[in-house]
A protein has these predicted regions:
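The canonical Cys-X-X-Cys-His
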Residues: 20-29
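Outer-membrane beta-barrel "beta-signal"
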Residues: 21, 379, 409-425
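Outer membrane beta-barrel
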Residues: 33-34, 41, 54-62, 76-222, ...
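Gram-negative outer-membrane beta-barrel proteins
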Residues: 62-68, 108-114, 140, 155-161, ...
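Detector for outer-membrane/organellar transmembrane beta-barrel domains
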Residues: 256-375, 379, 391
């Protein structure tokens, strides 16, 4: 499973609802400020109800892989201007205690592999991230409690800190890189269940310091199928699967700090198309940290996360795509950003995957280990219009820096330059 495919945007519909500028809620999209976190935890209910809480966005880009090794057909649309697609959002206050974030996305770079090995592109519209909330606020002299329920379709999409996977860095990345099969391996909670599940959680935020959330996820079918509309259930859950999140938050002066833990246990059918197929058991545990210095004109933010995944594989895998009945995968992410006047941005990121040696799963090197870095420059033409230049460099790929595939391809050959622009309206 590959990562670096999430996209997230600030919504003009929320700005119209609250009467606030985009920078009130966001450091840089989608990094939330303390006010933005309270807005989300309050169920998107701050402000006045809008008759049409609708917004949209569009993305165009150019992606260039470092080296095709003369095999250009394996990297279709390399170094070509592309309209990636766009999204429609229904997002805003539904009532005093109810609000929503619902995204539907048209992917113009949706691809399929043909019988002759070529790649065909065909646009496709599917459901994207959804977060529907009920919330209440209890305020007294010595007590400030926000509590509520969230129904969502992507574990951690409901989180208000940008150190967990769904809204973690990179916030924008090349869709073509995933078409080309380029990207680090990922734990299940890092997007493996996105738009395939329905989760219900109860949460509470006490005195703007302590956050707790307990929930459960199941497959998004039957009455919940709208949460997976158009998406293949490649990782079909069995039964109810617990999710936990705890964090400590402190805001003082221009500073904001949060540290937390999160985790999920998941029973996943070995064959997503067969509800009678055997089950694989995933155990994902994460720790995370976020720090923000929110001044004017200087802003600095950083996020860290570490996820440990242990997977118990059904016996049907052994000798086929796995050598052992249990494997482990560790994922580390770090990112730091600097913004000047909310207009000029620089971000530096690091990613590392380290897993169990398995010569059946990784026949060339025996290892999924992948490491690399991300450098990104941003310019905000307007508060709702961004231009970005991003470089993702690989120092190790699937267990090796050199000749990782046995055919002479090196890790650095997968490094990708990504020039993009997006606009929300």
């Amino acid at each position: 499973m590959l990562i670096f495919q999430q996209q997230a945007f600030a919504l003009p519909s929320y700005a119209r609802q609250t009467g606030e500028a985009c920078v009130a809620c966001h450091v840089s999209f989608p990094e939330l400020t303390p006010y933005g976190r309270l807005f989300k935890l309050s169920g998107y209910t701050l402000g006045t109800t809008q008759l049409f809480p609708v917004a949209a966005m569009a993305v165009a880009s150019v992606s260039k892989v470092s080296n095709t090794q003369g095999n250009d057909s394996s990297y279709p649309r390399n170094n070509q201007l592309q309209l990636e697609g766009g999204s429609l959002f229904i997002a805003g206050k539904l009532g005093d205690h109810a609000g929503m974030f619902s995204q539907w996305t048209y992917n113009n770079l949706n691809s399929t592999t043909q019988a002759d090995g070529s790649t065909a592109f065909n646009g496709k519209t599917t459901v994207d991230n959804n977060d529907w909330r009920l919330s209440w606020h209890l305020a007294k002299a010595d007590l400030d409690l926000i509590y509520g329920l969230t129904l969502n379709n992507n574990p951690t999409v409901q989180d208000v800190w940008n150190s967990t996977p769904a809204f973690g860095y990179p916030y924008q990345s090349s869709r073509l890189a995933s078409v080309w099969g380029i990207g680090p391996q990922a734990t299940l909670i890092e997007g493996g269940l996105a738009q395939q599940v329905a989760g219900l959680s109860a949460y509470a935020f006490l005195n703007k310091n302590w956050y707790a959330e307990i929930g459960s996820y199941r497959v998004a079918d039957g009455p919940f199928s709208f949460l997976s509309h158009g998406v293949d259930l490649s990782n079909r859950l069995s039964g109810n699967n617990p999710y936990l999140r705890f964090a400590y938050n402190r805001d003082w002066g221009m500073h904001s700090l949060a540290v937390g833990v999160f985790g999920m246990d998941a029973k996943v059918h070995a064959d997503g198309t067969d509800t009678n197929s055997p089950l694989d058991h995933y155990h994902d545990r994460g720790i995370d940290m976020q720090y923000q210095y929110l001044s004017d004109p200087h802003i600095f933010t950083t996020q860290l996360s570490y996820i440990h995944e242990s997977t118990d594989w059904d016996a049907s895998h052994i000798g086929n795509d796995r050598a052992t009945a249990n494997s482990k995968l560790n994922s580390f992410r770090a990112k730091a950003s600097y913004w000047y006047q909310h207009t000029y941005g620089l971000s530096i990121g690091y990613f590392g995957e380290h897993g169990t040696t398995d010569w059946t799963a990784w026949s060339n090197t025996g290892s999924p280990d992948t490491t690399g870095y991300i450098l990104e420059l941003n310019y905000m033409i307007k508060p709702n219009w961004r231009v970005g230049l991003q470089y993702t460099g690989y120092t190790k790929y699937q267990g090796a820096s050199l000749n990782y595939d046995g055919n002479g391809r090196n890790a650095r050959d997968n490094s990708t330059t990504y020039l993009y622009t997006w606009i929300a309206f």
